[in-house]
């Protein structure tokens, strides 16, 4: 009788030893994700009103393109990593059940890299669109900007948006799980594509809103709410109403001032205080979502 109990005890200790590295990795991944996002937001806030300069007035596929894409990647890291953290941690938890901790850790970052690659590539399409608009007309008319906001608002309630939002919220491990580490790249791409389908027009509206940090923060909160709250349709429909109404006002009132324009005139001290409060809220929401999804 003692021998089986001893084996059970040893097995229990071994199981605990196997779980501890996974738990530590879980925490390390969360800290690194939020640290990267924090650093990216610091860059955006430090740039202040100059963020829009390399992103709103490109001239050719050269240095301007590189500057645009670099700032686009920073923006994606700042805005999308906090919203993707729950899915990343869920991926790591499941992968760690069938692989060694080190393999699960590497696969998780392959998943993250593939996810960010989708958003980085979307920057090429965004640059091409801005370049075409700049060639046609130096500054988009207020009416066109208003129509862009209205289209983005209408998209919020379309079946395609709802399907992509549902797939973006649903753990990919439930539908497309593969045990090989190499497949982590494919799963990251797939998750990125669904998130792109869900959020792409929310990034398009940043251009008519002036690419201000305030507009980026507002869009981040919309995406975070759509991906983490229990009733995401309230966020989507609320954003739809605001975008359609504000876009309509821009169409009928061309001289309407930009709601987010004043953010670019805030002092560094105000930005620091505002950013600290906002980031605490983002961290709280992301941490709650991560705990819920990984559990």
Please state what every model-predicted region is:
Residues 2-74, 97-100, 137-139, 162-178, ...:
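Histidine-/acidic- and/or cysteine-rich, low-complexity loops and terminal segments associated
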Residues 4, 10, 69-116:
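Juxtamembrane transmembrane-helix termini in multi-pass membrane transport proteins
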Residues 19-50, 105-160:
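Membrane helix-loop-helix hairpins that form the core translocation module of multi-pass transporters
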Residues 81-83, 146-158, 216, 275-286:
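Hydrophobic cores of alpha-helical transmembrane segments in multi-pass inner/ER membrane proteins
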Residues 85-96, 157-161, 222-230, 285-293:
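C-terminal ends of transmembrane helices
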Residues 101-131, 198-250:
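A small-residue-rich subset of transmembrane alpha-helices
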Residues 136-145, 232-241, 269-272:
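Membrane-interfacial entry segments at the cytosolic side of transmembrane helices
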Residues 159-201:
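Membrane-interfacial catalytic/cofactor-binding modules of polytopic membrane enzymes
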